[in-house]
Amino acid sequence: MPTITVKDGTPIYYREAGQGPALVLLQGLMLTADGFWTKNFDALARSCRVIAIDHRSHGRSGKPLGPHSIAQCADDLGEVLAALDVDKAALAGVAFGAMVMLEYRRRHGNRRLAKLVIIEAQVRLTNAPGWEHPTFGNFPAEAGAGFLAACRQSREPLTGFLAGAFGTPPPADEMARMQLEAWQTPTAAAIEFVEDMIAADYRADLAKVDLPTLLIYGRKNNVPIPSEIGRWMQGEIRGSHLERFEDSGHSPFYESPERFNRTLAEFAAG
């Protein structure tokens, strides 16, 4: 099982295949490098050097007691890229993974990067004056606090989010597999990550992005992100390109894999 041990002693798991331009994949919260990209990894590896990483306390990576933060995951990413001698990579992040990407740029700039792929990302979860794109279309700070309180009482709110991640629900056995995958992240770690996500605000970072950037958003029954945040982000990131997946919800990589794989591979190689 390939891992990179980062400075605090935590082993970070990765999987790698293929040759060509480097494409690094960061999946969403509580999901894994082995399970998340089941419809994508092998197809992308036909034309790219693909590397998928388990965030700390996810999947096969180490499960330290804490603390857990987006910033720590960003620093872990930097150590993995250096250890694998990755340079000029296209870095693709989904949801939480995209937050890790934006935090990486805050802390490390464009080091080892050539392109960004922002997939189903939120840059501020909660409501704010003038902010038209909160999670669920309306997510007051009080709701965030209530969600965290509920998570401390029961695991159910953490794993329940998967039901709203698809425009068309997957088969029951697939949903069960994803639920089991999510259970690999300890509850305490997941709560710390969610707390950090709720506090995060990356809106001002977008205007500073100076790499070619692809934006991918689903538009079918997208419960977490019902608004046109993709169009807004396209206006914030100079020269970015938006791909709207009309037949997918919050999971275009799973619901429209052929188009997703083709779009990502062409962008990485272009």
Predicted regions and their residues:
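Conserved catalytic-core motifs of eukaryotic protein kinase domains, centered on the activation segment
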Residues: 35-37, 61-66, 128-130, 226-227
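Conserved loop-alpha-helix segment in the C-terminal half of the alpha/beta-hydrolase fold
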Residues: 208-248
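Conserved HGGG/HGGXW glycine-rich cap/lid loop of the alpha/beta-hydrolase fold
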Residues: 6-63
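Flexible "cap/lid" loop of the alpha/beta hydrolase fold
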Residues: 102, 106, 111-150
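Active-site loop/oxyanion-hole signature of alpha/beta-hydrolase fold enzymes
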Residues: 38-45, 51-96, 107-109, 261-262
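Alpha/beta-hydrolase active-site loop signature
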Residues: 30, 55-59, 98, 123, ...
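Catalytic active-site module of serine/aspartate enzymes centered on a nucleophile-bearing elbow/loop
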Residues: 240-270
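Conserved alpha/beta-hydrolase catalytic His-Asp/Glu region
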Residues: 127-136, 148-207
